[in-house]
């Protein structure tokens, strides 16, 4: 499966991969946790990732009106990308965290459900948005973000991730919206 490889050379990808720490058996046995905190500790790599996201937007001719990101780590990369593109950032949060009137969506998790909210005036009809987050696994959170945006009449033109865990069905769940991930790991 090809993601972004035609845009970035192997040296660039490998230098970025070196900033991700893998922690076996966290938070539970059998999980290989991909820790992004070393990358977050580096201004150089935060800038590099943001510039790579801009390059992907340009390469795909994505011209968004806003960037949307879910709590919590979508709040890291979303505002950085939005600032570089000269557009706004729209936060999607857990229930009760936004101060004004909101719309919400409940979505299923493997063992239970979750709720996300967005201000009801954050997006207007015809707004083009990109959803960004640190990690794509099953796609449930991003699918919920997409549905919230679409409820308000927005068009999700792309999804951006620092890391994608392959083989968990996220690409099928988010189809036909394009997905670009900087780093790909087996689930």
Task: Name what the model sees in each region.
Residues 65, 127, 157:
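Conserved acidic residues
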Residues 134, 139:
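Conserved G/P- and acidic residue-centered "switch" motifs that form tight phosphate/ATP-binding loops
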Residues 2-63:
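Active-site-facing substrate-recognition patch
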Residues 87-130:
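Short, glycine/charge-rich flexible loops or terminal/linker lids adjacent to PRPP-binding catalytic cores
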Residues 2-12, 143-187:
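PRPP-dependent phosphoribosyltransferase catalytic core
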Residues 76-85, 146:
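Short Gly/Thr/Asp-enriched flexible loops that form oxyanion-binding sites at enzyme active sites
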Residues 62-71:
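Short glycine-rich phosphate-binding loop at a beta-alpha junction
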Residues 30, 67, 89, 159:
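Residue-level signature of catalytic and energy-coupling elements of molecular machines
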């Amino acid at each position: 499966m090809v993601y972004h490889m035609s845009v970035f050379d192997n040296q660039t990808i490998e230098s970025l991969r070196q900033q991700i720490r893998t922690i076996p058996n966290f938070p539970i046995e059998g999980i290989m946790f991909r820790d992004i905190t070393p990358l977050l500790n580096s201004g150089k790599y935060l800038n590099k990732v943001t510039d790579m996201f801009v390059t992907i937007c340009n390469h795909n001719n994505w011209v968004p009106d806003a960037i949307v990101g879910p709590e919590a780590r979508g709040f890291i990369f979303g505002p950085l990308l939005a600032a570089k593109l000269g557009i706004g950032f729209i936060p999607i949060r857990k229930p009760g965290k936004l101060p004004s009137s909101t719309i919400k969506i409940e979505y299923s998790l493997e063992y239970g459900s979750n709720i996300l909210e967005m201000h009801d005036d954050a997006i207007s009809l015809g707004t083009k948005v990109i959803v960004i987050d640190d990690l794509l696994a099953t796609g449930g959170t991003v699918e919920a973000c997409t549905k919230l945006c679409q409820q308000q009449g927005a068009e999700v033109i792309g999804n951006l991730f620092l890391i994608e865990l392959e083989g968990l069905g996220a690409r099928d769940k988010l189809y036909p919206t394009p997905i670009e991930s900087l780093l790909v790991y087996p689930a």
